[in-house]
Amino acid sequence: MTTIVSVRRGDKVVIGGDGQVSLGNTVMKGNARKVRRLYHDKVLAGFAGGTADAFTLFERFESKLEQHQGNLMRAAVELAKDWRTDRALRRLEALLAVADKETSLIITGNGDVVQPENDLIAIGSGGPFAQSAARALLENTDLNARDIVQKALTIAGDICVYTNGNQTIEEEESIAEDKTKQGKK
């Protein structure tokens, strides 16, 4: 598997992932690029799960983004509909974490589209470790989004055997409201 984590803080949204590709209990590749920019570099996307499956989903998702002029939510919902109804797509085992300047979403293999609480996404085998680390850093530090993603991936890589330290991190400007400081005094 892998670890993908996304954080939105201040005027940035960041997605990062590790580079390990495993086949069973064997590391096949250590420098895979599981985080990419889509739709004229305006959408960030990362995947966890089967590599070939994820590339198929990336292609489909980018096609939906083009079809809906970069509307992230609409493209995600349309991809999820296809995923649920297309027999070939239903067999794909992957998760996508996607974000643009306004929205962060998880698209699941069950065809669900989830907008996570506080725009914090962590998927893959190291996801729970990265999510815990990122949440603690969001709530207890003033680190920027990129530093939080980097530290969360490092912590996940130290704990999860299916996650390595080779990180790919992409960031984009954000205009969404920063929910991490709401209700705090």
Swiss-Prot record:
Signal peptide: none annotated. InterPro entries: ATP-dep_Prtase_HsIV_su, Ntn_hydrolases_N, Proteasome_sua/b, Proteasome_suB-type. It catalyses: ATP-dependent cleavage of peptide bonds with broad specificity. GO terms for molecular function: metal ion binding; threonine-type endopeptidase activity. It comes from the Bacteria. Transmembrane segments: none annotated. GO terms for biological process: proteolysis involved in protein catabolic process. The keyword Heme does not apply. Its main location: cytoplasm. GO terms for cellular component: HslUV protease complex; proteasome core complex. The active site is at T2. Keywords: Allosteric enzyme, Cytoplasm, Hydrolase, Metal-binding, Protease, Sodium, Threonine protease. It is found in: Cytoplasm. Allosterically activated by HslU binding. Gene3D superfamilies: Glutamine Phosphoribosylpyrophosphate, subunit 1, domain 1 (3.60.20.10). Its EC number is 3.4.25.2. Na(+) binds at G157, C160, T163. It is an enzyme of class 3 (hydrolase). A double ring-shaped homohexamer of HslV is capped on each side by a ring-shaped HslU homohexamer. The assembly of the HslU/HslV complex is dependent on binding of ATP. NCBIfam families: ATP_dep_HslV, PRK05456.1. Belongs to the peptidase T1B family. HslV subfamily. Protease subunit of a proteasome-like degradation complex believed to be a general protein degrading machinery. This is ATP-dependent protease subunit HslV. The gene is hslV.
